[in-house]
Amino acid sequence: MTAQASEARELAAVIGLEVHVQLETETKIFCGCSTDVADAEPNTHTCPVCLGLPGALPVVNEGAVEAAVKVGKAIDADIPAETTFHRKNYYYPDLPKNFQITQYDSPICQDGELEFSVESERRSVDIRRAHLEEDPGSIKHVREGSGPLESRTCSIERADYTLIDYNRAGTPLMEIVTEPDFRAPGEVRSFLEKLEEVLEYLGVFDATRDGSLRIDANLSLVDASEVGEDGDIDKSVLEDANRTEVKNISSHKGAEQALSFEASRQRKLIQSGRAVEQETRHFNETHGNTVSMRSKEEEKDYRYFREADLPPLRVSHWKDEVPIPELPDARRERFVEEYGLSEEAASKLTSTKQVADFFEDVAERFDANLAATWVADNLLGELNYRDMAITDIDDRFDEVTQLVALVAEDEITAKNAHETVLREMLDTGDDPDTVVDREGLGKTSGDEVQQAVVEAIDENPDAVEDYHSGEGGAINFLVGQVMEKTGGSADPGDVNGLLREELES
């Protein structure tokens, strides 16, 4: 095909994902080593099993199986009566056994589905399979020097040597494999956000853990004419298209960025009449591009065979015995119906399980609309402004509730509570009473407000005349004068009413 003909082709992206999720368990998947390795010295959370020493025998972690069943039920997948483990053979420094224990032809979950929204439009992606496996260790490429190790980590091309930490080796992973149902990088980002939301609600995933979500994405471009109106593509078309696998993606934003770059790269190759190599590429977060790593492996290269040290795992009884909590979509609908919230407010309040739980705690004590305003708008808004997450203040929920109580009990104005007290609480770590006392924000008594109203009227005859002439801004000016006299501690609505009474008397 000539370059001119290639340039005229309209191309469509076909994207499939392999999402590796670290499951939240106390110990590793096949041994008793702790998974709490964030602050541990390298290679201190290891044993003969996760290091693959001769004679060491694996035992399946019940907590990992339970977490996998929860995920399967949440994505409406088929969970077989029995599942098995296999060895995936390949040689890489972070894999101490030179094989990975995973699942091959009998995964614990298959044929699932996950719904999500893209710009308010509902979408659905088929989940081909979700299986259990062990995480490899972690590799750091390092430059020579005298500074801290973290400051000397770099790309493999620039490294003087490489260090391997096997603390992570054996951490339980669930690999979730989608069908190639995505047609745009933005869809991938929305899907990952929804998947992480569901995993967090299930309690099987900790997004704050380093490397807890890693994505491999497969992308190819096909003629747009091959894509049906419903987005379906004939399997033979996909088999003929060369695809690239992009690795080292660790975030929703990174996935969108990596796939946008890769789609553009492939489009330029095709439009110039060149072939797209079937290969594995590495996503460079710093530069926002992908670079070639190696030719893409095929399934046969891994020489899968049954893991003889692990018997078949019977999981049929788990499907009925393992419950799952109310998931975000169901909770969102309930918030709209039960509390009369808007769709927008309900979406904010169910963005994480912790936010939703906190809202319901506050709503039990106070009016639901007041609780929604404080949690969805005030609290989340201030956290977002500071680039903080709800998990950063989960030990201060009682203090936030105490602040809402001051507003509900008319001890402080809503404006001062939000714009002064809440902001200072987040910036200084002080409790609400301390901020209120320091700033003198206790609500002014009725007599003091009435006195300030009279003084404002007496001192501003021009504004009074404007008010009686129908000038709309006059009352706002007088409210401002009263608020200034009371140090902002009066309620503006109350002041407005008192001024009108006094002016009309």
Curated annotation (Swiss-Prot):
<keyword id="KW-0547">Nucleotide-binding</keyword>
<dbReference type="GO" id="GO:0050567">
    <property type="term" value="F:glutaminyl-tRNA synthase (glutamine-hydrolyzing) activity"/>
</dbReference>
<dbReference type="GO" id="GO:0070681">
    <property type="term" value="P:glutaminyl-tRNAGln biosynthesis via transamidation"/>
</dbReference>
<dbReference type="InterPro" id="IPR006075">
    <property type="entry name" value="Asn/Gln-tRNA_Trfase_suB/E_cat"/>
</dbReference>
<protein>
    <recommendedName>
        <fullName>Aspartyl/glutamyl-tRNA(Asn/Gln) amidotransferase subunit B</fullName>
        <ecNumber>6.3.5.-</ecNumber>
    </recommendedName>
</protein>
<dbReference type="GO" id="GO:0006412">
    <property type="term" value="P:translation"/>
</dbReference>
<comment type="function">
    <text>Allows the formation of correctly charged Asn-tRNA(Asn) or Gln-tRNA(Gln) through the transamidation of misacylated Asp-tRNA(Asn) or Glu-tRNA(Gln) in organisms which lack either or both of asparaginyl-tRNA or glutaminyl-tRNA synthetases. The reaction takes place in the presence of glutamine and ATP through an activated phospho-Asp-tRNA(Asn) or phospho-Glu-tRNA(Gln).</text>
</comment>
<dbReference type="InterPro" id="IPR017959">
    <property type="entry name" value="Asn/Gln-tRNA_amidoTrfase_suB/E"/>
</dbReference>
<dbReference type="InterPro" id="IPR042114">
    <property type="entry name" value="GatB_C_1"/>
</dbReference>
<comment type="subunit">
    <text>Heterotrimer of A, B and C subunits.</text>
</comment>
<dbReference type="InterPro" id="IPR017958">
    <property type="entry name" value="Gln-tRNA_amidoTrfase_suB_CS"/>
</dbReference>
<dbReference type="GO" id="GO:0050566">
    <property type="term" value="F:asparaginyl-tRNA synthase (glutamine-hydrolyzing) activity"/>
</dbReference>
<dbReference type="InterPro" id="IPR014746">
    <property type="entry name" value="Gln_synth/guanido_kin_cat_dom"/>
</dbReference>
<keyword id="KW-0436">Ligase</keyword>
<dbReference type="InterPro" id="IPR003789">
    <property type="entry name" value="Asn/Gln_tRNA_amidoTrase-B-like"/>
</dbReference>
<dbReference type="Pfam" id="PF02637">
    <property type="entry name" value="GatB_Yqey"/>
</dbReference>
<keyword id="KW-0648">Protein biosynthesis</keyword>
<dbReference type="Pfam" id="PF02934">
    <property type="entry name" value="GatB_N"/>
</dbReference>
<dbReference type="InterPro" id="IPR018027">
    <property type="entry name" value="Asn/Gln_amidotransferase"/>
</dbReference>
<dbReference type="GO" id="GO:0005524">
    <property type="term" value="F:ATP binding"/>
</dbReference>
<dbReference type="InterPro" id="IPR004413">
    <property type="entry name" value="GatB"/>
</dbReference>
<keyword id="KW-0067">ATP-binding</keyword>
<comment type="similarity">
    <text>Belongs to the GatB/GatE family. GatB subfamily.</text>
</comment>
<dbReference type="InterPro" id="IPR023168">
    <property type="entry name" value="GatB_Yqey_C_2"/>
</dbReference>
